[in-house]
C-alpha cells in the first residue's frame, strides 16, 4: 500500500489561489487551456454575433441617413428663407457697422465765446523734443487738462534738406509751440508740475529723457498769436515784393545797358568801314583816319546829345516917356 507523500495543506492552498485568480485569455492560450472543439464552437458563436451586430449597425445607419436627409431638407428650406430675408437684415445692420460716418471730421472750437476766451490759458513751449508730432504732444499734456488748440513752428526747410542730404532722419521736426488750455488754472498747473522735469514714461520711449520747457503766458490769448503770425506773414510778403521789384529794376537796367552798348558798337563799326573805303593812299589813309575819327566822334556825340529848344525871352519892361508919366500922374 502506497503512502501519500503530498502535503494536503499545500494542495489546499494551491486550489484557493487558483479560484481567486482572475481570467486571462493570453495565459489560457499559452497553456493550452481549451480544446480545439471548444474553440471551434466559440468561433461559430462569435461569427453569429458579428453578423447580428452588422445587421444592427446597418439598421442604425439607415435610420441615421433618414434623419440626416430630413435635417438637410429642413436646413435647405431655412437657407432659402434666410436668403430671402438677407437683404433686409443687411440694410438694417448697416448703420450699426458704420457708427462714425455722420461725425464731422474737424474738431469743434471749444473757446469761441468771450467768456470762454477769458477763462482760457496759453502755454508756450520754447523747445519741442526732436521729431515730436502735435498728436504726441497732445497725448502727453491731455491728462493735466482739456486742450483746445496746438500750434507748432516747423523747422527751417533748408536745415531739413541739409540733414536728409547728409543721411539724417527724414522726419519733420518743430522748434517751438503754443498750447491752448480750456481753463487757465490747468495751464498754470501744467507749468508748475512739468517745467524743467523729464517727460518720463516707458524707458524704451523716444522722449523718456527729454526735459519740458514750459511757460504760462499771463494775459496772452490765442487771437494774439494769430495776429502775430499774420503780421509776420505780411512782413515777409512785403519784403519778398521789395526784393522782386529791386531785382526786376536791376534786370531792366542791365538789358538797357546791353542794348546801348550794341548801338554804340554798330556806330563805331560803320564809321570804321567808311574810313577804310575813303583811304586811297598811306598819307591819305592817315589824314582820312583823323578826319574819320573826328566825324565818328561827332556822330556819336550827335547820337548822345540832344539839342534843347531855347525858350522865348521875356520882354523887358520899357520906361515910359516923361510927358506920359506927367499926364498919368495928373490923372491918377
From Swiss-Prot:
- InterPro entries assigned to the protein according to its UniProt record, in alphabetical order: ABT1/Esf2 (IPR039119), ABT1/ESF2_RRM (IPR034353), Nucleotide-bd_a/b_plait_sf (IPR012677), RBD_domain_sf (IPR035979), RRM_dom (IPR000504)
Composition bias of kind Acidic residues appears in 43-59
Which GO terms of the cellular component aspect does the record hold? Answer: nucleolus
Pfam families in the record: RRM_1 (PF00076)
- Tell me which residues make up the RRM domain: 121-211
What superkingdom does the record give?
Answer: Eukaryota
GO terms classed as biological process: endonucleolytic cleavage in 5'-ETS of tricistronic rRNA transcript (SSU-rRNA, 5.8S rRNA, LSU-rRNA); endonucleolytic cleavage in ITS1 to separate SSU-rRNA from 5.8S rRNA and LSU-rRNA from tricistronic rRNA transcript (SSU-rRNA, 5.8S rRNA, LSU-rRNA); endonucleolytic cleavage to generate mature 5'-end of SSU-rRNA from (SSU-rRNA, 5.8S rRNA, LSU-rRNA); small-subunit processome assembly
- Which residue ranges have biased composition labelled Basic and acidic residues? 18-31, 85-94, 292-302
Q: Which GO terms describe its molecular function?
A: RNA binding
The record's listing under CDD domains reads: RRM_ABT1_like
Residue ranges spanning the membrane: these are none
Subcellular localization(s) per the UniProt record: Nucleus, Nucleolus
SMART domains under this entry? Answer: RRM (SM00360)
Q: Which UniProt keywords apply?
A: Nucleus, Ribosome biogenesis, RNA-binding, rRNA processing
Main localisation, per the record? Answer: nucleus
Task: Return the annotated region ranges for Disordered.
Answer: 1-100, 269-302
Described purpose of this protein according to its UniProt entry: Involved in the small subunit (SSU) processome assembly and function, and in the 18S rRNA synthesis. Required for the early cleavages at sites A0, A1 and A2.
Query: Which family does the entry's similarity section mention?
Result: Belongs to the ESF2/ABP1 family.
Protein name, per record? Pre-rRNA-processing protein ESF2
